């Protein structure tokens, strides 16, 4: 992960798998993912969405998780949204909350699955602006997107899929 070599083995079906469960859990704790449809918990406020994983996964105190969450909400331009519920927000705002949630885990790599495809066209720019800022910070991101201009602008390596084939 991000230059760190992990021990892998080949299972009976020929797939590469982690050699042990602890290694796999450690690997997963260093990744965050932002989904196409945000995957925010609708019954929780924005702040509650952001502090849940750091508390459960890392055993972080609520105060520390809250401080971290507020820092990342400010980074995505939503510092005044912590008491809102996702259903009261635009798609672009929800996606920025999802990005802030990913950042609260302070991952080495962030995976983005079509982060703008479920958004109205006028909301795409606000999400791309946040992602551009992350790229400028030097964050490692793997992005699946149809926003080709954006991908060319922020990437140092592109892989194209065309007719289910990889084109480098």
Language-model-detected regions and their locations in the chain:
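H-loop (His-switch) and adjacent beta-strand-loop-beta switch element
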Residues: 158-168
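H-loop/switch region of ABC-family ATPase nucleotide-binding domains
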Residues: 145-146
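Conserved ABC ATPase "signature" region
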Residues: 4, 8, 15, 62-80
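A short, proline-enriched helix->beta-strand linker immediately N-terminal to the Walker B motif
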Residues: 104-108
